[in-house]
Structure formats: C-alpha cells, structure tokens
Amino acid sequence: MINPIKYNISFGYRGADNNSAEVNTKKPVRTSIFYVNDFHGKAINMERAVTASNAFDRFTFQKPTDKLKLASGDIMLGEDIGVNRVAMQFLKFIGVTATAVGNHECDMKSEDFFSEITGMPATLLACNIKNPQDSKLSKYVQKSCVQEINGTKYGLIGTIPSDLISRIKYGKVLQDQNIQPANIDETIKYVQDEVDKLKSQGVDKIILLSHSGYGYDIKIAKNTNGIDVILGGHSHNLLNGIQKDINLFYSKSGEPVIITQAGRDGKNFGILNLEFDKNGVITKAQNNIGTTRDFSRNAIARYIFEKIKGKPEIIGEIRTAPPALKNDLTEPNPLAYYGADALRELTGADIALIGAANMRGYVEKGKIDTSVIEEISPFKNKIVKINYTEKEIVDAIKYSAKSIKSRNNKPGIMYVSGLKYTMTKEGDVTSLSYIDKQGKECPIDINNPRTDKIYSTAINDYFSSNNDGYDMLNKYFEATERYSWDLNYAIEQKIRAAKEPIDIVDDGRIIITD
C-alpha cells in the first residue's frame, strides 16, 4: 500500500546568488498528485487503478493538502470505440480533471475521434498543435487551463508528441483536419508562451502534462522557466523516487523541475507529493510508484466496463502463471513463448517471431476469459507468413538483442518459436539454434549465416513492414500467406484446445548471461 504523506526528499532553490537560493517555507502549500499515463485501453488495470485511486481519496493528510488527479495521454488505444469509451469512463471514475493528448487518443478515424472526445470527462490539453484557430480540433483541445483547489491556483499545460503523425494509424485523415504537431524547439517556445500567460494571471504553480517523451521532457525542463512539474508519458519510462539528473532538473533560472512517468499499459500509477514555498517554488517532494496488480479489480468499474464492451467468456484455466516482468522489453517472457508457439502451430510455419513491444498483457492463475486475451496484444496486427533467409533471421535476432543496452530498451528483444538463443547482458548473441517440429536442435552459425537456407516464418504485419528498425524483415509484400486474425486469436484457440489446465513457464528458449 502506498503512503502518500511522507516527505523524505528535500531540496531548495538553486539560484544565481546566495539571496535567491534562500527558501521561505513559513507558509508552504502542500500538494499531492495522483497521476497516470499510457494505460493503452487496458481495462483490467484500469479497474485495479480505480481501487488505488479510491484509497488515495480516502487518505487523510495530517496537514491541509491539495489533491489533484491528472493524466499524460495514451489512456485510449486503437480504433475500437468500446475500448476508448472504457478509457474515458476510467478517467471519470478516478476523477482526472485534465489530460494531455497522446498519439493513441488519435488512433481513431477523424469522425470517431471528434464524436468520442465530445464526451471526454477531462479537459484535453495540447499547446503545440500547429493548426488554424477555426480548426475543429481547437474547439475540443485547450492549450492550458487553471484549476483552483482550496484557494490555490494550478496552471496546467499539455503537449502532444512531435512524432504524432508517424505514430497513428490514420495520419493522413488527421492531416486533412489540419492536425500538425510542433517540433521540439517549437514546442519549447509554445510551452514557455503558456507559462508566461499563466504567470501573468498570478498562477505560480505550473504543471506540464507532457506526451512528448522522456528525452524531450528533459529538454523542456532545462530550456524553460516557470515549470514546476512535468508529468510525462509516451516513452514508457518508469521513474520511481526523485534523483538528480534522472528526474530532477533545473530550469534556466535555477528552479527545480520534477519529471515523472509511470511506465506503460497501466501496470503502474504514481503519487507525487509536493511542498511549495510562498513564491511557488518546490522545496520538498516525494515521488511514489504504485503497482496496479497490488490492488483488486473494482467491482463497479468492472461491471460498467463489461456493459460497454460485453461480458467476457471463460475459455480455459491457467494452472501455472509466470511472475510479473520487471522489464517487459528485455526479459524472457513465457507468455510470449506460448503465443509464438500458437502462431507456429496455427500457420504451420517453421518458426514464429513476436517483437517484445507487441506483448502488453499478462495472465494470472485461475480461470481465464476473453477480456484477458484481448489485452495480451491489443494492436490487432494481422499475421502473415513470409520466407526469410537464415541470414535475415540472424540479423533480426542480433538487432533485437541490442535493445538490452539501447535507450529505453527499444525496440525490445524478439520472442521466438522454433528457435532458441543465448545472449549477453551487453546485447551480444552468442548462440542460436533452430528447433524442428520433431524437437531436433540444429545449431546455426551466427557468424556466417546462410543466404540459401529458407525458413517460413509467422510474423505480424507491423514487424514485417520495416518498423522499429527491422529493415531486414521488410518483406510484407512478399508474404506467402496473409491471415485475417491476430496473435490474440491464436492464443485463444490454443487455450480453448487445451484438454487440461495450462502451465505457462519459462522453458529456457532465451537465455541471458553475464
């Protein structure tokens, strides 16, 4: 359980001279922010987060404390209206008053986008959209707003990701609506303009709801004045606590700026406790990250969500479930292995590949229903079968292994069926073998892979279309088979066909050594 009151990290104003470094804390303002980002339509984790939010609401502080509920975007996902209505209901359930516009809020077709956000319970914020004032979007999205709690005014600003158009499915449609994000340099200027506007109104506590990503958030923090907190998203970092040069930076004028982010897929949420001096400068802070799996699913939220999406069907039973991953981009994932096996079996391919970025869900011991299945890989990427050379497969595995040392661990390692490999913690592949359908292991020379050896491969349409740097897999238009179903369908069919409860365990097909 999270204790949202302990203020155990203290820092003062780092000004240009001794006088400006002095902090007056005679009349501090205390603030506690419950924040969420990048839930990606995950209804089950939303249900758990509702329980956590309710606990936050019930908590009584020893001293007067303002409470805020804020989001940093990508609470929605995809074009499924039901999924996105659940996301909006979630924001209403937990009482979020403002949210940044993320790229996944824009996944829908433009007509659906505008229809659905009409009912958005929170204020949509994005100051860095370059579009005419008469654009339809400007009627729904504000650059900033002011929220007043117990007589204290908080200025809230939002940013949309600069790579928006490349990250949404209907980019051309949204371009037709004159939706164009600013680049980072322009974004910094637009953010500063909003800060200055709020400051001129007497607001001295400024929170940026950013869906720009961690790297850009750091640039914004260092190159602006007046921002106190950046509640971040988009890059899926998990920033626990407060550490200098990690998520504590200083503005151009030397004031502290705290950056937060709570990972992805609703696995976590955050509570940021703050104390401001009379000038609106942070003097104390604590940043706690909570895990949604530590909280039960809220019964009322579950009922409402099922009314929106339909009641799920129980399809099987999990006898052994794998433990939660600490890093779901770089760790062996037994559920991904199960999914890859399902793809290989259903397509009859020699091997199957699943990029770690596509694995978003988890299973627990006990009965499993279709609502759990649909959250395992929510992107609905269709499966194809493609002939790849041994060299192309080796190059893909080697490329994915480098994720363990790359920034943000992207694109993530490649999960496999019909293969097994060993890699080091430095991201070097040291061995690779093909496992034929009779279980025979055939070593592959990773230093001299064959170009005349072909493997039929089950893979999705995303990773076979030159995304995430996998240029060696860019053969979508050479597919020998195209299927109308996705990874979730394959997993569901495998579970339904099981005659006994299922054990999902690590079989050692990917080993990471020192």
Where in this protein do the model-derived segments appear?
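Non-Sec secretion/translocation targeting segments of pathogen effectors
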Residues: 1-23
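Compositionally biased, intrinsically disordered low-complexity segments
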Residues: 8, 12-14, 26, 49, ...
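Compositionally biased regions
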Residues: 11, 21, 54, 145, ...
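Compositionally biased, low-structure terminal segments
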Residues: 12, 60-62, 296, 306
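Acidic, metal/ion-coordinating pockets
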Residues: 23-292, 330-336, 342, 352, ...
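Catalytic centers of hydrolytic enzymes
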Residues: 27-30, 36-42, 179, 262-514
